Amino acid sequence: MLNPSGTPEYEMDMKEAEAALHAYMNGFMVGGGVTVDNARHFIIQGASHVIVTSYVFKDGKINYENLDKMVREVGKEHLVLDLSCRKKDGRYYIVTDRWQKFTDTEVTVETLKELEKYAAEYLIHAVDVEGKKAGIDEELISMLGEYDGIPVTYAGGVSSFDDLKKVKELGKSKVDVTIGSALSIFGGDMQLEDVLKFINEE
């Protein structure tokens, strides 16, 4: 849902999103351009959660007014905060607007604890390694493994079963993971059935 609201492209995106949600009720999350104006619509249409970044992180800072509005609109049980980040000066900062704009908010265990009362889950893309199939961000995962709270899902660079093992080890079995371009269904080499078997055996 990255096209601007009101454009023909947005309407086409919305139509396809609704069709997918109806086909698998409460099985999909929706992200991209989610605001307080459309979040409830996605939940009503069947999304289990909405994923939010830019609406909450405005002008480089956490906009607690918008965050409170979103929680009131859909409930924290339906809200995933996307804290996708890039490294700058040795620290990880949340980025917005298709990962192009740095915020002033650093991703730390303290930040995760501060925001956990507003959300059901965190989604954290390691933007510097995202989509490259060149390995995971071990430093970021190690930091996430120090957090005890709501579920955390890491994304970025997973391209092998060794990477999955590292996520489990470095994340102390507390960090979930997404796999994108490395999966066979997206043109990669990792067979979905083998991934599921590996995870269940682990």
For each feature predicted by the language model, list its residue ranges.
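Glycine-rich, proline-tolerant flexible connector loops at the mouths of alpha/beta enzymes
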Residues: 1-15, 54-60, 124-133
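Conserved beta-strand positions in the central sheet of alpha/beta enzyme cores
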Residues: 1, 51-52, 80-82, 123, ...
